[in-house]
């Protein structure tokens, strides 16, 4: 399989403090990578570097197969919609095509079709004319995932997508993301605190550690590694 993203000896800082040191890993098209790690280990900094919005202190990130940073569909951490936010579901999803639209004043019929297909794929097409504030937390995340899907050519980057959702909505969203990976062959990079779900769904694990070397490998290799002992043990408490 073709490499879609390669990170070589990446070093990056947050507020002048080095949080990522000589990190190397790569993922191929169609893989599902979960990024784990304790608070302060550099997960958010890595996301910003992967998106191209934060320069690294050293090393390099290479996107493969002609992919550009604007071709990455990004779903940020869940935050409640602002009171009075006027946009409809279809307007929010269509905004995911801004990178495709460029400097044109209006969206093309092809871009509108991409948005419609994304809403259908996420099961929210019947909510297209609803206001964002009318949606449940799970529906809002599906809407934002549909927007990210409009941007994504081959890669989705999801930052703790189930944070704040109830168990039912979380399970449904995990299932949708898995289908996008398995059926649509979309490459997934997901930051997560849920080790059990990460081991269940991912094909690769990247664990960032603030006090020791980082880990990159398969879920099976991670589960049997010394690095996993602390994290898995903590979640069993």
Model-derived features: positions:
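The feature captures the beta-strand-to-loop junction immediately N-terminal to the Walker
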Residues: 36-38
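Conserved ABC ATPase "signature" region
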Residues: 94, 109-127
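Helix N-cap at the start of a conserved alpha-helix in ABC-type nucleotide-binding domains
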Residues: 167-169
């Amino acid at each position: 399989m073709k490499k879609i993203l390669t990170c070589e000896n990446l070093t990056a800082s947050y507020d002048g403090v080095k949080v990522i040191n000589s990190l190397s890993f790569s993922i191929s098209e169609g893989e599902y990578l979960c990024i784990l790690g304790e608070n302060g280990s550099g997960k958010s900094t890595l996301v910003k570097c992967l998106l191209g919005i934060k320069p690294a202190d050293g090393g390099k990130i290479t996107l493969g197969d002609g992919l550009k940073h604007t071709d990455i569909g990004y779903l940020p951490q869940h935050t409640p919609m602002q009171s009075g936010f006027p946009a409809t579901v279809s307007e929010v999803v269509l905004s995911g095509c801004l990178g495709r639209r460029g400097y044109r004043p209006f969206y093309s019929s092809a871009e509108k079709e991409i948005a419609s297909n994304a809403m259908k794929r996420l099961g929210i097409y019947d909510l297209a004319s609803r206001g964002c504030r009318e949606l449940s937390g799970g529906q809002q995340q599906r809407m934002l995932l549909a927007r990210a899907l409009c941007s994504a050519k081959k890669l989705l980057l999801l930052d703790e997508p189930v944070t704040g959702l109830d168990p039912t909505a979380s399970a449904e969203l995990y299932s949708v993301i898995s289908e996008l990976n398995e059926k649509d062959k979309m490459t997934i990079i997901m930051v997560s605190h849920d080790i059990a779900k990460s081991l269940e769904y991912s094909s690769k694990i990247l664990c960032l550690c603030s006090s020791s070397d980082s880990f990159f490998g398969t879920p099976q290799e991670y589960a049997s590694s010394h690095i996993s002992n602390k994290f898995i043990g903590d979640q069993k408490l």
